[in-house]
Amino acid sequence: MKKVRLTREGYEKLKKELEDLKRKFMYEISERIKEARELGDLSENSEYEAAKNEQGRVGSRIMEIEQILSNAEIIEDSEENDEITLGKWVVIRNLDTGEEHKFRIVTPQEADFFAQKLSSDSPLGKSLLGRKVGDVVKVKAPSGVQRYQVIAVMNK
């Protein structure tokens, strides 16, 4: 498998998720399966089926995270400059509406809209990589072409 690029923060977040899932997998789900078995006939036992399904889902996620972490390449904060690269915080202004947005450019595995983390593989993320303060980018959106100007680029 090829290397998976992650920021240090993204790597640590996945490690924590893995630890939490293993704990859940080892104790909570196993206990629920045990309790459901004690209820008797497994063929009509919805609690048993639900616990087994969750066990499968959690087990799959554990394997997925282990695969990502074993192939991870950590992206360290790059030097202070105004070029947009992975891990940088960016402030852009929509030139049509005047709205400003701040987010961090991250790998697809770390993208999280609610935490202001934009995937480098998204149309906007792709158009911003390598750009500098003052540059204008055009992004095709469902509502039409949007124009954004880079206002600031920061490491933190």
From Swiss-Prot:
Pfam families (alphabetical): GreA_GreB (PF01272), GreA_GreB_N (PF03449)
Keyword DNA-binding: yes
InterPro entries the UniProt entry points to: GreA/GreB_C_sf, TF_GreA/GreB_CS, Tscrpt_elong_fac_GreA, Tscrpt_elong_fac_GreA/B, Tscrpt_elong_fac_GreA/B_C, Tscrpt_elong_fac_GreA/B_fam, Tscrpt_elong_fac_GreA/B_N, Tscrpt_elong_fac_GreA/B_N_sf
GO process terms (BP): DNA-templated transcription elongation; regulation of DNA-templated transcription elongation
Coiled-coil parts of chain: 1-32
GO molecular function, one term: DNA binding
Keyword field: Coiled coil, DNA-binding, Transcription, Transcription regulation
PANTHER family: TRANSCRIPTION ELONGATION FACTOR GREA (PTHR30437:SF4)
Family of the protein in this entry: Belongs to the GreA/GreB family.
Function: Necessary for efficient RNA polymerase transcription elongation past template-encoded arresting sites. The arresting sites in DNA have the property of trapping a certain fraction of elongating RNA polymerases that pass through, resulting in locked ternary complexes. Cleavage of the nascent transcript by cleavage factors such as GreA or GreB allows the resumption of elongation from the new 3'terminus. GreA releases sequences of 2 to 3 nucleotides.
Protein name: Transcription elongation factor GreA
Organism expressing this protein natively: Thermotoga sp. (strain RQ2)
Gene name of the record: greA
